[in-house]
Amino acid sequence: MRIAPRRLLALVLFLAASATAPASAQSKLKIYISADMEGIAGVVSGEQLGPSGFEYERFRGFMTNEVLAAIEGARAAGATEILVSDSHGNGQNLLIERFPKDVQIVRSWPRPLAMMEGIDASFDAVLFVGYHASTVNPQGVRAHTMSSANLADVRLNGVSVPEAGLNAAIAGHYRVPVAMISGDDAAVKEAQALLGPIEGAIVKWSYGFHSARTLTPEASCDRIREAAKAAVGRRAQMKPYVLTTPVTLDVRFKSYRPSEVLSYLPIVERTDAHSIRFRGKDMIETIRFLEFVTNYEPGLTP
């Protein structure tokens, strides 16, 4: 077929303009990163995990570096927009001045969607950085679920879940898949057993609740960067973790008192001395209830 010169010129100009179009005019690739701290390389005790610990300030930097490595890997695979959730302790751990200016960060508590605040259906994939195993897992470093002091088990539709499972279910409500997790070997194995063949970046190997063999901070960042790039590249192969509804939430406390008092609520069923059951219409209603359970105190002040 012969193309008239004017039409040919118009076609060439159109293709040239398309090739140089700004990123905002092209398709976006949105990534959500939820960051915890117990699964950061080198973390083995409370000395690294909060302001009272003598190593905390250094390990805030290591946590920040691992999240930045995940961002770099995601961008190498084409990510154009990234939201980070600072989801450990007081939610004010990440050194935000070190982040690229186009990255946004969710900080502090409370939040209706807990460690996944800000997630919605516009995101393409989720990455977990610095995650740990569940409270029922005897293998993980600093293993717990939501509250190390108060909760003995959390179940969704009868399945005991780690925080990775809870947060994957929140993302799954919006049909967004989890594509990667970093942490110790127990956390990665537990998440992959629940969520399927997501990318796993193991940065330490657990010897017990307070001991591990660990990569150096630099080596852990290299591993996370590679895993994040692979995860975003494979995102189409990942399946969202979608729960059937209504969602049945079972929570077992270490003490009898919370279950006793919560059973006064008409929406709560006490299933044994230490356990309660709540049925939410979906995962969003369920996580909001769990956030209430783990955050409410009668003496709350601003």
Regions found by a protein language model. Give the residues of each.
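Active-site glycine-rich loop that binds ribose-phosphate moieties when present
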Residues: S148-Y174, G183-A186
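Short catalytic helix/loop segments, enriched in acidic residues and glycine
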Residues: L49-A69
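C-terminal accessory domains and tails appended to enzymatic cores
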Residues: I82, S220-P302
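A glycine-rich helix N-cap at a beta->alpha junction
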Residues: K101-I119
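Active-site rim beta-loop-alpha module in soluble metabolic enzymes
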Residues: I170-V178, S182-A227, A231-V232
